[in-house]
């Protein structure tokens, strides 16, 4: 009887051990799909970007497709942490939905990109200057804009180069090949975007501006709080100068520098353009207070930045001087008062006395320094 009882206990223990083994195996099988789901979830988090064709603000013919391909190649080489939509797929969406304006993103275009192209963000590249005359010149601004509402500028950067910026002794470093200068310009932009996509976040302009290009006249109201975050809409500058698109170009400079400060939420210029069209606002000589009220109301902004481009000159070849002349002001929405304004005029050879040392050869590089120094007076 005792033996039978011990035998029964042993059988029960044996069966219990087998049951535990099956339970452990089943648990492992149950957890395996969770691991796969987690891996797919991480991959799904990679941002999907639609790179628009280069928008030409140079006023002259330029190899826009070559610039786009160069940018995509450099981003791929830098192993940017993003998925880029194939150009033929993007072209098909643009054609199907008749998207005509590629220099900015409005709500309707963003929805198309999000739904039809499944894009999380759009890369917008604007060409300001392109010249193959020796020494060649190029200027580019690029920005990444989210397609989810509210649209947000996630990243923006730019560059302006001339082949004779750093010619070196006996011109041994002079760049005469336009394609070489193009690669030299695009590569830093691709690196900057790659760094942002890797999680480094927004950074202020790393290049130190030349103090000699600071504004001549500055006004700043005490009502403008330095420790407050403002939402600002930058309106294209009134442009009586001889340079086509100078108003849009200078607006991009201010957007870039305000974004870099960190305490300004800058409205995507495509939304500003959309509101100007919908409200039928025509700036014959600048923006009026009534127009500023309309824009601030519909875009829900604290400040409106606008101004006037008096001169914006580039030159071809070796002989010439880059010139930039502008005024800008910030209008506060509630008080309808100007809380900040500047006036700035400079030439590329300001303060240059020997061997062209310190000379600035493109209006882009000159305006970049001037606008950065002007914007810094807001803080």
Regions found by a protein language model. Name each.
Residues 2-12:
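Bacterial N-terminal signal peptides that target proteins for export
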Residues 12-21:
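Bacterial N-terminal signal peptides
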Residues 26-47, 69, 113-116, 132-137, ...:
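C-terminal/domain-edge helix-coil "capping" segments
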Residues 46-48, 58-118, 122, 235, ...:
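N-terminal segment of the mature soluble domain
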Residues 56-59, 90-92, 128-133, 161, ...:
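Solvent-exposed loop/turn segments at secondary-structure junctions
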Residues 138-145, 324-330:
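A short beta-strand signature
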């Amino acid at each position: 009887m005792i033996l039978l009882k011990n035998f029964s206990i042993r059988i029960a223990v044996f069966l219990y051990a087998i049951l535990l083994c099956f339970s452990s195996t089943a648990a492992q099988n149950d957890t395996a799909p969770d691991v796969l789901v987690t891996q797919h979830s991480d991959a799904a988090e990679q941002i999907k970007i639609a790179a628009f064709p280069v928008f030409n603000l140079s006023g002259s013919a330029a190899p826009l497709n070559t610039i786009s391909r160069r940018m995509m190649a450099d981003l791929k080489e830098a192993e940017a942490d993003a998925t880029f939509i194939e150009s033929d797929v993007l072209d098909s969406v643009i054609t199907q939905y008749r998207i005509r304006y590629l220099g900015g993103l409005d709500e309707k275009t963003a929805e198309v990109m999000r739904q039809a192209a499944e894009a999380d963000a759009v890369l917008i590249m604007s060409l300001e200057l392109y010249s193959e005359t020796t020494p060649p010149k190029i200027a580019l601004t690029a920005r990444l804009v989210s397609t989810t509402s509210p649209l947000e500028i996630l990243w923006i950067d730019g560059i302006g180069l001339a082949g004779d910026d750093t010619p070196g002794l006996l011109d041994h470093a002079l760049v005469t090949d336009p394609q070489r200068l193009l690669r030299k310009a695009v590569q830093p932009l691709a690196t900057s975007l790659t760094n942002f996509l890797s999680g480094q976040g927004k950074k202020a302009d790393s290049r130190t501006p030349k103090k000699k290009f600071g504004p001549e006249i500055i006004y700043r109201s005490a009502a403008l709080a330095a420790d407050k975050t403002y939402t600002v809409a930058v309106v294209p500058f009134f442009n009586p100068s001889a340079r086509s698109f100078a108003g849009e170009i200078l607006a991009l400079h201010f957007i870039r520098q305000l974004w870099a400060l960190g305490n300004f939420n800058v409205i995507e210029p495509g939304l500003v353009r959309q509101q100007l069209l919908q409200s039928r606002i025509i700036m014959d000589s600048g923006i009026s207070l009534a127009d500023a009220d309309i824009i601030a109301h519909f875009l829900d902004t604290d400040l409106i930045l606008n101004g006037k481009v008096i001169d914006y000159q580039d030159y071809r070849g070796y002989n010439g001087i880059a010139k930039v002349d502008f005024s800008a002001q910030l209008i506060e929405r509630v008080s309808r008062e100007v809380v900040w304004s500047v006036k700035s005029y400079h030439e590329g050879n300001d303060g240059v006395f020997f061997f062209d040392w310190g000379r600035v050869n493109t209006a882009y590089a000159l305006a970049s320094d001037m606008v950065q120094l002007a914007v810094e007076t807001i803080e």
